[in-house]
Amino acid sequence: MTQLTHINTAGEAHMVDVSAKNETVREARAEAFVDMQAATLAMIIDGSHHKGDVFATARIAGIQAAKKTWELIPLCHPLLLTKVEVKLEAQPEHNRVRIETCCRLTGKTGVEMEALTAASVAALTIYDMCKAVQKDMIIGPVRLLTKSGGKSGDFKVDI
């Protein structure tokens, strides 16, 4: 089994030194879902929500979250992201919203946490904007879909 990289030999948490790593193009995609009642989803789709455009707000929140991941997750490095994309898709057949994010950079460490944080915060923003009309929405699952670049190689979730 692979060792945890954020734990030193004394068992203490530390930020990984990436200075000796090669710069490569790194990309990660993640997804999250927000399940809700049909009426709540219809309000989002038809734009009648009193707080405004739910998808636009969630998209911006996800982008901002990716850029601030290093401030939220203690051992993440601050990164110079070159791409953050947040796609939101209403899925009326399932009474939910699907969020897919993509983060990219050329650097020495991966962007998995940035993609996951973007998806999570976009989902939380949808909840925040819609909680006045429905409090029992369900967020999840949130998961990494793909990652590429870096020493550990590529990853793709089995769908």
UniProtKB/Swiss-Prot annotation:
User: Known catalysed reaction(s)?
Assistant: (8S)-3',8-cyclo-7,8-dihydroguanosine 5'-triphosphate = cyclic pyranopterin phosphate + diphosphate
The parts of the chain that form a coiled coil are none
Q: List the disulfide bonds.
A: none
User: According to its UniProt record, which residues of this chain constitute the active site?
Assistant: D128
Q: Which InterPro entries match?
A: MoaC, MoaC_bact/euk, MoaC_sf, MoCo_biosynth_MoaA/MoaC, Mopterin_CF_biosynth-C_dom
What is one process in the GO biological process aspect for this record?
A: Mo-molybdopterin cofactor biosynthetic process
Q: Name one GO molecular function term.
A: cyclic pyranopterin monophosphate synthase activity
Statement: the UniProt record of this protein carries the keyword Lyase = yes
Matching CDD domains: MoaC_PE
Q: Which UniProt keywords apply?
A: Lyase, Molybdenum cofactor biosynthesis
Sites where the protein binds substrate: L75, C76, H77, M113, E114
Keyword Lyase applies: yes
Write out the pathway annotation from the protein's UniProt entry: Cofactor biosynthesis; molybdopterin biosynthesis
- The catalytic activity of this protein is classed by the Enzyme Commission as 4.6.1.17
Q: Partners and quaternary state? A: Homohexamer; trimer of dimers.
Q: What does this protein do?
A: Catalyzes the conversion of (8S)-3',8-cyclo-7,8-dihydroguanosine 5'-triphosphate to cyclic pyranopterin monophosphate (cPMP).
What the entry lists under PANTHER family is as follows: MOLYBDOPTERIN COFACTOR SYNTHESIS PROTEIN A (PTHR22960)
Record family assignment: Belongs to the MoaC family.
Protein name (record): Cyclic pyranopterin monophosphate synthase
Which species does this protein come from? Yersinia pestis
Name of encoding gene: moaC
